[in-house]
A protein has these predicted regions:
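Nucleic-acid endo/exonuclease domains
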Residues: 1-118
């Protein structure tokens, strides 16, 4: 489910580019608090169907405590989850494109491809 303008924009860019992708992609064993699966916003596949790169859109709550998202406690959990996701990608040699909320207006095919190393 697309929750934010940033996620909707990323979806549109990937879809319009004709890139094969899935939303809310998870890996077995990658879990957060209370063993809840940690999902990546988007997984983009290459021509062979293998993972090319993952895309995460990080809203403001990824960078500072926001009361409506649960304040400091939720922020601390969010940071732990973000670290786990980054570590997973590093350990499994998977490219991770992280798009911060303050770059929301810059989201484009070129922006995503540059961030993915193309």
């Amino acid at each position: 489910m697309l929750d934010s303008y940033g996620e909707i924009k990323i979806h549109e860019v990937l879809e319009n580019a004709g890139l094969p992708f899935r939303e809310e992609y998870e890996f077995p064993g990658l879990v957060g608090h209370c063993d809840v699966p940690l999902r990546f916003d988007f997984c983009v596949f290459d021509d062979c169907g293998d993972i090319d790169y993952l895309v995460e859109y990080n809203g403001e709550q990824h960078y500072k405590p926001i009361k409506k998202f649960g304040g400091q406690k939720a922020f601390n959990r969010q940071r732990e989850n973000d670290i786990k996701k980054k570590r997973y990608c590093l350990d499994h040699n998977i490219k991770l494109v992280t798009i911060p909320y303050y770059d929301e207006g810059k989201i484009s095919y070129d922006y995503i491809m540059r961030a993915a190393g193309y």
